[in-house]
Amino acid sequence: MAMSNHIEQVRERPEAAVSQGILLPTLHELGWPVFDTNVVVPEFSVQGGRVDFALCNPPRRPLIFIEVKRVGISEGADRQLFEYAFHSGVPMAVLTDGQEWSFYLPGEQGRYDERRVYKLDLLEREIEEAVSRLERYLQYERVCSGEALKSARADYQNVARDREIEATLPRAWASLLEAPDSLLLE
């Protein structure tokens, strides 16, 4: 009974608990000065609202927006995050409930889900993979140097290419099967 209560508490953990208990310690491990509110800015004001966190360099100039939701309640939050990032000119956005981390490039082409570079589920991935992805996109030095954004853009191009292949391969295969083969006709 105690374990089921614990699981229920995790599921009902409010956004603030996810921010304080998961996000900020993760950012700290990734080298972010989480106590410098000019660099890791909570409740960053944007036109029409506030984003949960803005990761800034130089201070108060956001490079990444992070929106935090309760565990399992991140559906639909991508639209709000995209609007904030797009109107503010922020090149990268992260949506997390602490367990799942979705990394987006709001300025790229396509629907919201098509602009997702990577979706990381901390419970489904190997620890090394999770660490590698978090460092790739969110490590302080990589973000400040622009390497994180370059990596995200390269990963986006790979995802977009794979999506294009998936869309065109069935049509190409069908046209090959429909076309008469001149070698067989002779």
Predicted regions: what they are:
Residues 1-92, 100-186:
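A short, conserved, highly charged catalytic patch centered on acidic carboxylates
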